[in-house]
Amino acid sequence: MNYIFITGVNRGIGFFLTKELLKRGHSVIGTYRKDSDNNKLQKLKSTFPKTLNLTCLDVKEIEEDELTTYLNSFKAVDILINNAGILDCGNVPFEKLQIDDLSRSIEVNTLGPMKITQLLLPKLSESASPRVFHMTSQMGSIADNQIGGYYFYRISKAALNMFNKSFSQDYPHIPSIVIHPGWVRTDMGGNHAPISPEIAAINISDLILTPNNLSSGNFYNYKGEILPW
């Protein structure tokens, strides 16, 4: 059994990934925002009372001392999944963008995962087989950008990818991977997305639980295929 820390578990990919990992017998430490609808999450907690641990956390406003104290109740964290993210402003034309608003996307999609990873380093170091995964997007690939647009989302995810690459070089004993989960039917992905969140959760679980098939520092899609930077 692995102890798995996941951010943003109250909806979308985070919720179904949590559910899938619990069904597979793992223990999940999940974070959710105070202002989110947690009814489904509380029902899941009642189904897995011993293996689902929940804590309120906003990746934009992390109370470091509070999170550190909470984490001290766990011996180690084996897997960190930085899942929380936003698609801010969507595909607004460049000339209409409020450039200062980029900071919100950077705070959530880039700085949030960096802060969480930093705070969890001591607990990851106590694991016999630590691993770090970040939910990124193919839209963060510079080489794959053939249509432009989505400035804030692309920039923040490209920055996350670079953080992961540097981290993998500095901490070779902690494999670190960025994963593109595919276009998933969530509030962010919309109703026309071809992949259900349940299937996305299965795909991602298969990837993160077979670490020997992945090389640290790389950028993978949900099929385990390497994507271009």
Q: Which role fits each region the language model picked out?
A:
Residues I86, G90-I106, M114, S125-Q169:
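Catalytic loop of short-chain dehydrogenase/reductase
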Residues D58-K75:
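Conserved Rossmann-fold cofactor-binding substructure of NAD(P)-dependent oxidoreductases
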Residues N10-E20:
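N-terminal Rossmann NAD(P)H-binding glycine-rich loop of SDR-like oxidoreductase domains
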